[in-house]
């Protein structure tokens, strides 16, 4: 007897081993663990136990519903095509008949067929019995559906799946020998022909499906679904289960059967004559069994969606017609053989093939084999049997099957955790949620947002969409390469050493900041500034007798707020320069706020004390009001009177600065990768992007790979503030580097990385992130401001700004944008660093913009293009001039103000009524002048009665343009004849006055 362990048996049944062990123990099988052996008799006991347990609760009726959704396009009343969803629902009910009634009918059928048998049936099922008992156990062990099979024997069960063909069943009934009747308690003569195909299933190879299996799989696992389906299709007689005690034939006897079969083959004519009397009754029986077969197969499919192997087509039919029943026993039978051997006129050949396919191809995998001549019927888990060629399924059955399968996938909803980055496209969001992009777009449309599949969503919107779909949204930064920077910073910790202080000179414009630095550096810097004002951050380091000091000179003009903030961020000490003759000014207060916000100590330099009108005491009082208290008043801020012209007090100032530096104990690691801050950046035509860097820690070397914001590169050249090449730069040293891929933003942090590939990855990540965030914000702004300007006469002044350095661009754009009013809005279409190129002029043509160049000039080709298209190019080197001219241009775009001016007064002294003309007034001009095109007000008793225009003005008989004071005239009013003696006419004009910002 064949045996295997509980664990192996559970693997075959695809169920947990411990559950199977409990079921075996409940059936009375004494097993200790999952490693114990299971015999065929144990399996039979398990099958009997499960049938007893599930038989009482077996359902009598199965109701199947099918829903199919399709779309049609139909034109509406306006002629536009609309898509309409059409849903078709169908229901089918299968009723299980009473087993007693079926048993009676089967007994009568067996009696009729026994008389028709001339030759004993072939005893093929015996060796397959033990093998088939195991699959029966497997099907019964599945608690998904109680087993319907109550038939006694598997060989008998197999033919029941082919009730439609009557003739072939009789044709195969003849060659069966009688041992089948001895082996089974209740043999059924009609279904016997299927025994040979069922045995062929147990062969090692199943070529009908092009599936290669081992002998064990073929004997135990593969026949299982077929047998289960067949047992369900048999009549429900309460006969005993297939006997495990039946002798198991050796492989030799199993292979010898096909050779012996041809000797007992009967002629086709005899078979038909013997079957003729029972034909009417059998037709009814076959029709009933066909319905039962379909219901049982549907139950099998619904309970166990496993891949099913088809039983091969019965060989004896082909043999009866061609003289050969089987191929040699060594070769497994194939389903294609009967088709080749059968003649076109052979009775029942085609029908047998069809019924065999119907009974043995219940599978959910519709794409597992190539289509044959007769397409097998396929049943899906959520639909009915889709007929093959010529069946109910039709050509669209495969598409319908795919639609049904897709519907089922949608029904199985699984809530997931969706990580939503800062920006994500609609397509990516749909992919993360495993839904179609169209569903996401539909949901966004419900939320009031019209999007496309590639549109970028911001994080908040994407999280709302995820929650609408029932998933859990988590705001996250996945795969952020910047995490690498934190790891690098943690690893590269070095010993800190003393460093030079970084001192920022701040103050109001024209208070002498640069002149003070000029004296300290002994170099003429201020004379080279345009307009005598600083428009860049200058970085210098000075060697004094007490050490090195690095100075940053910031602009004082109000436009350079961001630059001053950057200067305070990068600095250790702030020198606040205040003119002794001018006192505290707005930018002085702003510098104090920047210093306090950064927690930076202040040193006040009261400049211009050499002037006669200097008043240092007034400056002290004003600074005390700003909470900057001098040391002599009990505060902590040193006050040093200096003169940038004579040099008085400069040494005291430096001494105070170095004293503050000693108190701060400034330290930084030197032997470490450099980190710094981008002070300024520009695009040089010959050298490319150039950045001024203040090294804050570590040592920057020539050839280092650096990352600055969204740009990266290798340091190709390094210059100090005097333009000399240097190889290294330590902490607190300002340098100018070349070799970056693009111009970084001023204020970006710079750091040295060991891996250029990683630097490129982080830079590209930052670029994409910046672009996505910018686009998402623009989209949100568009949606919010869509109706803001609707109906308003808002005018827009478009500008393209090109500057020499990043800081100037930032300051200029900020200043120009602040000029916007409710009526005229300044729109900076494009702002960048570098000269004015042809592409800038093309952009100006497209957007009708004015091009502003700040310390830059246009290329020759750009100049010609601008002249040809009438584009206005403006060059400036002082920020005041640029702001003032843009303000003047905006004033010209403002709607003029209309004012009313009274120019004369007329009194009515005579009134004449003339036909075809109307009422004519004879008047005297009392004051001013009356003009023909003027407007008038009719005054009666000093109350305004009417306002309008003069229709005509005459003096005597002549039309005149105007009549001055002291002269009489005749006039008519346009659209008004109500004139009386004593009325007065007030003559006025409306003048337009240009407005200014």
Curated annotation (Swiss-Prot):
SUPFAM superfamilies: Initiation factor IF2/eIF5b, domain 3 (SSF52156), P-loop containing nucleoside triphosphate hydrolases (SSF52540), Putative DNA-binding domain (SSF46955), Translation proteins (SSF50447). GO terms for molecular function: GTP binding; GTPase activity; guanosine tetraphosphate binding; translation initiation factor activity. Residues 498-665 form the tr-type G domain. It is found in: Cytoplasm. Residues 281-292, 400-409 have a biased composition (Basic and acidic residues). CDD domains: IF2_eIF5B, IF2_mtIF2_II, mtIF2_IVc. Belongs to the TRAFAC class translation factor GTPase superfamily. Classic translation factor GTPase family. IF-2 subfamily. NCBIfam families: IF-2, small_GTP. This is Translation initiation factor IF-2.
């Amino acid at each position: 007897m064949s045996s295997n362990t509980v664990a192996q048996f559970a693997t075959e049944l695809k169920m947990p081993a411990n559950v199977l062990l409990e079921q075996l123990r409940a059936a009375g099988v004494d097993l200790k663990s999952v490693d114990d052996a299971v015999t065929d008799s144990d399996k039979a006991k398990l099958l009997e136990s499960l049938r007893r347990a599930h038989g009482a609760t077996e359902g009598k009726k199965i109701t199947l519903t099918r829903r199919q959704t399709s779309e049609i396009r139909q034109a509406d009343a306006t002629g536009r095509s609309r898509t309409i969803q059409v849903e078709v629902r169908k229901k089918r009910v299968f009723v299980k008949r009473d087993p007693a009634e079926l048993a009676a009918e089967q007994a009568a059928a067996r009696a009729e067929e026994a008389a028709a048998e001339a030759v004993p049936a072939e005893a093929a099922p015996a060796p397959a019995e033990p093998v088939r008992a195991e699959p029966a156990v497997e099907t019964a062990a599945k608690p998904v559906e109680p087993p319907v099979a109550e038939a006694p024997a598997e060989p008998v069960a197999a033919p029941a799946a082919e009730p439609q063909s009557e003739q072939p069943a009789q044709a195969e009934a003849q060659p069966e020998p009688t041992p089948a009747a001895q082996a089974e308690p209740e043999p059924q003569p009609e279904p016997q022909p299927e025994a040979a195909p069922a045995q062929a299933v147990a062969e090692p190879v199943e070529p009908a499906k092009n599936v290669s299996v081992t002998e064990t799989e073929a004997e135990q696992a593969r026949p299982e679904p077929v047998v289960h389906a067949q047992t369900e299709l048999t009549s429900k007689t309460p006969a005993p289960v297939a006997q495990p005690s039946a002798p198991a034939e050796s492989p030799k006897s199993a292979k010898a059967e096909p050779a012996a079969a041809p000797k007992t083959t009967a002629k086709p004519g005899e078979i038909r004559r013997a079957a003729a009397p029972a034909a009417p009754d059998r037709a009814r029986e076959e029709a009933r069994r066909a319905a039962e077969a379909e219901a049982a197969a549907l139950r099998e499919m619904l309970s166990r969606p496993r891949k099913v192997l088809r039983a091969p087509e019965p060989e004896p039919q082909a043999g009866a017609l061609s003289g050969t029943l089987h191929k040699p026993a060594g070769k497994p039978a194939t389903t294609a053989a009967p088709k080749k051997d059968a003649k076109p006129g052979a009775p029942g050949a085609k029908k047998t093939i069809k019924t065999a396919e119907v009974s043995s191809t219940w599978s959910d995998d519709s794409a597992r084999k190539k289509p044959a001549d007769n397409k097998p019927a396929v049943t899906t888990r959520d639909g009915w049997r889709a007929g093959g060629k010529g069946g109910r399924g039709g050509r669209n059955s495969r598409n319908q099957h795919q639609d049904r399968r897709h519907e089922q996938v949608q029904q199985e909803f699984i809530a997931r955790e969706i990580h939503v980055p800062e920006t994500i496209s609609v397509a990516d969001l749909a992919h993360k949620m495993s839904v179609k992009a169209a569903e996401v777009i539909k949901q966004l449309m419900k939320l009031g947002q019209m999007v496309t599949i590639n549109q970028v969503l911001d994080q908040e919107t994407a999280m709302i969409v995820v929650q609408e779909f029932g998933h859990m949204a988590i705001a996250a930064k996945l795969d952020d390469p910047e995490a690498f920077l934190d790891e690098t910073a943690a690893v590269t910790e070095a010993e800190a050493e003393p460093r030079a202080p970084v001192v920022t000179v701040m103050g109001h414009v024209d208070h002498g900041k640069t002149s003070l630095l000029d004296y300290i550096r002994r170099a003429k810097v201020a004379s080279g500034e345009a307009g005598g004002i600083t428009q860049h951050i200058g970085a210098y380091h000075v060697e004094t007798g007490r050490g090195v000091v690095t100075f940053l000179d910031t602009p004082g003009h109000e436009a350079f707020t961001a630059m001053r903030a950057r200067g305070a961020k990068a600095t250790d000490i702030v020198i606040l320069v205040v003119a002794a003759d001018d006192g505290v000014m707005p930018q002085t207060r702003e510098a104090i706020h920047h210093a306090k916000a950064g927690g930076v100590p202040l040193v006040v330099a009261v400049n211009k004390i050499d002037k006669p009108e200097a008043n240092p005491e007034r400056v002290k009082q004003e600074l005390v009001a700003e909470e900057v208290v001098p040391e002599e008043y009990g505060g902590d801020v040193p006050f040093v009177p200096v003169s940038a012209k004579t040099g008085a007090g400069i040494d005291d100032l430096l001494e105070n600065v170095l004293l503050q530096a000693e108190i701060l104990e400034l330290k930084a690691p030197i032997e470490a990768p450099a980190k710094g801050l981008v002070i300024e950046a520009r695009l040089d035509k010959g050298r490319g992007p150039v950045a001024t860097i203040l090294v804050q820690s570590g040592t920057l070397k020539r050839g280092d790979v650096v990352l600055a914001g969204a740009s990266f590169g290798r340091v190709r050249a390094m210059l100090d503030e005097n333009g000399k090449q240097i190889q290294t730069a330590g902490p607190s040293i300002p340098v100018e580097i070349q070799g970056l891929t693009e111009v970084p933003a001023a204020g970006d942090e710079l750091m040295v990385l060991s891996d250029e590939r990683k630097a490129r990855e982080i830079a590209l990540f930052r670029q994409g992130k910046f672009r996505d965030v910018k686009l998402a914000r623009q989209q949100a702004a568009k949606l919010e401001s869509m109706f803001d300007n609707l109906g308003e006469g808002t005018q827009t002044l478009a500008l393209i700004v090109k500057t020499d350095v990043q800081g100037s661009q930032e300051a200029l754009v900020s200043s120009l944008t602040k000029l916007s009013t409710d009526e005229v809005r300044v729109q900076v279409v494009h702002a960048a660093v570098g000269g004015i190129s042809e592409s800038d002029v093309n952009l100006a043509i497209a957007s009708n913009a004015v091009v502003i160049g700040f310390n830059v000039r246009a290329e020759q080709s750009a100049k010609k293009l601008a002249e040809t298209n009438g584009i206005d190019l403006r060059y400036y080197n002082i920020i005041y001039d640029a702001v003032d001219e843009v303000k003047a241009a905006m004033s010209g775009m403002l709607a003029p103000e209309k004012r009313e001016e009274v120019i004369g007064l007329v009194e009515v002294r005579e009134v004449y009524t003339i036909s075809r003309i109307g009422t004519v007034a004879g008047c005297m001009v009392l004051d001013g002048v009356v003009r023909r095109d003027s407007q008038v007000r009719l005054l009666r008793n000093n109350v305004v009665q009417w306002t309008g225009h003069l229709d005509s003005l005459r003096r005597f008989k002549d039309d005149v343009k105007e009549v001055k004071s002291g002269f009489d005239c005749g006039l008519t009013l346009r659209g008004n004849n109500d004139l009386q003696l004593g009325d007065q006419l007030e003559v006025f004009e409306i003048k337009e006055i240009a407005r200014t910002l």
